[in-house]
Curated annotation (Swiss-Prot):
It comes from Shewanella pealeana (strain ATCC 700345 / ANG-SQ1). It comes from the Bacteria. The gene is anmK. The lineage of its organism: Bacteria, Pseudomonadati, Pseudomonadota, Gammaproteobacteria, Alteromonadales. The keyword ATP-binding applies. Pathway: Amino-sugar metabolism; 1,6-anhydro-N-acetylmuramate degradation; Cell wall biogenesis; peptidoglycan recycling. This is Anhydro-N-acetylmuramic acid kinase. Belongs to the anhydro-N-acetylmuramic acid kinase family. Keywords: ATP-binding, Carbohydrate metabolism, Kinase, Nucleotide-binding, Transferase. GO terms for biological process: 1,6-anhydro-N-acetyl-beta-muramic acid catabolic process; amino sugar metabolic process; peptidoglycan turnover.
Amino acid sequence: MNNNYYVGLMSGTSMDGVDAVLVSFDGDQPSLIASHTEELPKALLSSLQKLCLPGNDEINRLGHLDRSMGKLFAKAVNALLETANIDKSQVIAIGSHGQTVRHMPNLEMGFTLQIGDPNTIAVETGIDVIADFRRKDIALGGQGAPLVPAFHQHVFGSPNHKRIILNIGGIANVTYLPGNNEDVTGFDTGPGNGLSDAWIQHQLSQPYDKDGAWAKSGTTDQKMLQHLLSHPYFALAAPKSTGRELFNQAWAEQQLSEFGHLSEADIQSTLLDLTCYSIANDALKLSENGELYVCGGGAYNSELMHRLHKLLPNYKVVTTSELGMDPQWVEGIAFAWLAMRYHQGLPGNLPAVTGASREAILGSFYPAD
């Protein structure tokens, strides 16, 4: 009987569900044993979206949602273990990212806040939980994000190839693996699926633009695209990170105010190109050529992938499936890996990526007993 499993839990800025993965780290590379996605109930999703923006009665709403998300995370874990026919005693720990509701690392007293009470997860599953991975890095002067580059370096690094690992969730982030372990870097490029998801939800009441079909039916407005790309964030040097606090529906609608003559489909196409151009511009700053491996929800958007191909002709643009890892589960596996690093007393951040003053063991421990 294998008693060396970890569970990874991820709910990203796109809020499209809770991903739960069961992972073994017995070999050189992590092995995905089972996976499960728990859908966010509509009422819970709506409450989360409201909490991500400034509003009234925030503390009461946060306290309630913290418990509610903890219960949903636990439900995802229990369903995962039932699917895999694995007993909780075989799992060393759960690595829970939580649901980000604020990420503001650049204030004088920078902070990040993820909810999904780890105590509730531990009690409801009977498994020890490691959570709160980002705040140690911020305490050390870092951005607290992105955290996945250390994992990307471990599993995707190659001494013979220049690789960029691109994760496209609500926000997009890149990890540059230049072929040596000294110069790894990573940062958030800007919007991922978040703006285009919000636009189609608002206009067509669809959760996302499947295969980018609606964007494909429109025509990008170059004036609007250049206006969006003029945002100061895109000119910032790394380390940098961003979130829904900056690139959200309210920001998009503010930018759209002078482009009311455009069709809804043209706006969708332009928002998709904002994602693609901001990614491509940063990729070309890192290297003129190489291999780009895409993971996250954006990997399944065929129009997005097509546009990246066109913008990066000297890159091999494929998904992480070519490296043996399903794009949907990469982030979940990364947080199982971070839990394993905590359990073994090993650092989980890359100071060159986040700007932290040193490496550190990330996370806090929440026992089931």
